[in-house]
Design a protein with these regions (language model features):
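N-terminus-centric sequence/structural signature that marks the extreme N-terminus
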Residues: 1-130
C-alpha cells in the first residue's frame, strides 16, 4: 500500500510551501512505499503532495507520483487499484480521447479519464479500491 502526505493552505511565513517539511513527512512513511518517492508543490495554490510508492501494476518509472496529466491541468497522488483500468483505457482509445500513454499504471488512466469525463464521471466508471 502506497503512502501519501501533504498539506493545503496554512500560514507560510515566507509565502512558500516548505519542501523540507514535506520531505520529513514523507520520510516518516517510507515503509508504506519503498519503490520510489515524489514531491509536488504549487506555491500559488499553497499546496504540496508527497508520495511513497509501492509499485504493483506498473513497475516502471512511468508510474511515478505525484503524476501530472498530459493536459497539465491535473495532478494526483493516489493509492489503490482500479480493477477495470484496462477497460477504461480501452474506452478512451475507442473514443479517440486517449493521451500518448507513458506506461501502464491505473493512475495514468484515472488522470486521462478525469481530463475527458471529469472526476465524478470517471470515478463512477471505476471498480476497485481507492
Amino acid at each position: 500500500m502506497c503512502g501519501l502526505v501533504g498539506f493545503l493552505g496554512g500560514d507560510f511565513s515566507n509565502g512558500h510551501v516548505n519542501n523540507d517539511i514535506l520531505q520529513k513527512m514523507s520520510d516518516q512513511i517510507v515503509s508504506r512505499g519503498p519503490d520510489s518517492e515524489g514531491i509536488w508543490i504549487d506555491d500559488s495554490l499553497r499546496v504540496g503532495f508527497a508520495h511513497r510508492r509501492l509499485a504493483i501494476l506498473d513497475l516502471t518509472s512511468a508510474g511515478h507520483q505525484p503524476m501530472t496529466s498530459q493536459s497539465d491541468r491535473l495532478v494526483i497522488t493516489y493509492n489503490g487499484e482500479i480493477y477495470n483500468s484496462l477497460e477504461i483505457r480501452d474506452e478512451l482509445v475507442k473514443i479517440e480521447a486517449a493521451p500518448i500513454w507513458r506506461g501502464h499504471s491505473d493512475t495514468e488512466i484515472l488522470l486521462a479519464g478525469f481530463d475527458v469525463w471529469g472526476i465524478k464521471d470517471t470515478i463512477s466508471r471505476c471498480t476497485g479500491m481507492f
